[in-house]
Structures are given as structure tokens and as C-alpha cells.
Amino acid sequence: MSQSTSVLRRNGFTFKQFFVAHDRCAMKVGTDGILLGAWAPVAGVKRCLDIGAGSGLLALMLAQRTDDSVIIDAVELESEAAAQAQENINQSPWAERINVHTADIQQWITQQTVRFDLIISNPPYYQQGVECATPQREQARYTTTLDHPSLLTCAAECITEEGFFCVVLPEQIGNGFTELALSMGWHLRLRTDVAENEARLPHRVLLAFSPQAGECFSDRLVIRGPDQNYSEAYTALTQAFYLFM
């Protein structure tokens, strides 16, 4: 069996320049992560941090979008997900500049001396509720192992003065996250509200915070046009990644 045939049979997602297997990860590749990885500002970055790396999707997307000199650290608490992220990265063109760490981000941060120009996270956002099928799924869905104040604190401890901390969240939760971030000294610099189509209200929000004050740029992104095909804006944002776009 050829390698390509083997890869395509695995449980994962094929992009133009890399493949992400996610069968051992609690949270699968989805639109939220793809949006965040394509949207986060990468101009001039030298060092990136992916908090809660999961399958390694965001780290791989950042690697594709940045120069060969950029180093990316991907921190994942759950050992099976971290192992799969490492496998995905090893099979990518950027294995030498993405470092996977199986660690609790709150402990890992205390051991670091470098600061990051870009920090990215697709964080859990549900309060603990209905019990999940596995502890891994619960960890990925609920803010039990890393709540939002702790996440913001971790990012603040290792970001450069002009760096960006980027997240994707449901719209209402994103509004609360923004209020919390502002109260902790962060400044909102970029905001994109995401709607499925023009007729619907936004259901997701992409947020970029910085320690440095400055103008906040806001816009709206519609995923699908009237014909139900991907909109021009969504296509422009993601076409470097989607295989058939």
C-alpha cells in the first residue's frame, strides 16, 4: 500500500501542504481552528506559541504561513493528542521548526525564558455540564483544566510587548472573554465576527489582544454566499489550505 493511500485512509483531514490525523484527539479538525489558523496576524513574527495544540493543526498552519526562520512551540496537556500532533508534524515539511511539548501550560510557562510574538489558542469554552464520554473529550470541551483567567495570565507572562494573543470563541462567550481580558490589562486590537451567511447573526468571533494599546480594527466575515458556496472573503482567507478550493 502506498504512503498516500495509507494516509488518506486514516481518520483525518487532508490540506494542500499537509495532513492532520485526529483520530486520537478529543476535538477534531473543524472550521473554528481553520479560521483561526488562517486569520491570525503573522507579519514579522519570530516565535509562536500554540496553547492546547490538540492535533497540531494551528501549529502547522502557522508554519505554512511563516518564514523558515520562525520557531513554533506547541503545548498540549493530553498525552495521546500530543503524540498524534508530533506524528502529524513529523510528516509535514516543517518538522524541524515545530516543537511539541506534552505539558501543563501553566507549569511549562514558568520554565521559559523566551517571549512570543504570536500566541494562538482554540480554547475550551463550556462550563462543566453533561459528562463526556472520555476524560480527554471533557478536557477539550470544558474549562476545567485551564479556565479563561488562567489562559490570559499564561499568555501575558510570555508575550512580547507588541505581540498578539489570538483566540476563536462563540460570539457571546467571546464578548465575555473580551471584558475579562480588558480588565486584566489586555488591549483588543483585532476582531472579526463570523456568520454562516448574510442572513444569520455571527456565531463565532476571532479576537486578537495585545499588551500594547492601539486602534482596534473590526470586521465581519460571512462563510457562505447566497448560492451556498464559500464566499469570496472566506475563500481568500482559507484557499491556501483547503485541498479543493
UniProtKB/Swiss-Prot annotation:
Organism superkingdom: Bacteria
GO cellular component: cytoplasm
GO BP annotations, alphabetical order: methylation; tRNA processing
Keywords, in A-Z order: Cytoplasm, Methyltransferase, S-adenosyl-L-methionine, Transferase, tRNA processing
UniProt-listed Gene3D superfamilies: Vaccinia Virus protein VP39
Record Pfam families: MTS
Subcellular location as annotated: Cytoplasm
Leading EC class: transferase
InterPro entries: DNA_methylase_N6_adenine_CS, SAM-dependent_MTases_sf, Small_mtfrase_dom, tRNA_Adenine-N(6)_MTase, tRNA_adenine-N6_MeTrfase
CDD domains (UniProt xref): AdoMet_MTases
PANTHER family the UniProt entry points to: TRNA1(VAL) (ADENINE(37)-N6)-METHYLTRANSFERASE
Functional note: Specifically methylates the adenine in position 37 of tRNA(1)(Val) (anticodon cmo5UAC).
Protein name: tRNA1(Val) (adenine(37)-N6)-methyltransferase
Lineage, opening ranks: Bacteria, Pseudomonadati, Pseudomonadota, Gammaproteobacteria, Enterobacterales
Gene name of the record: yfiC
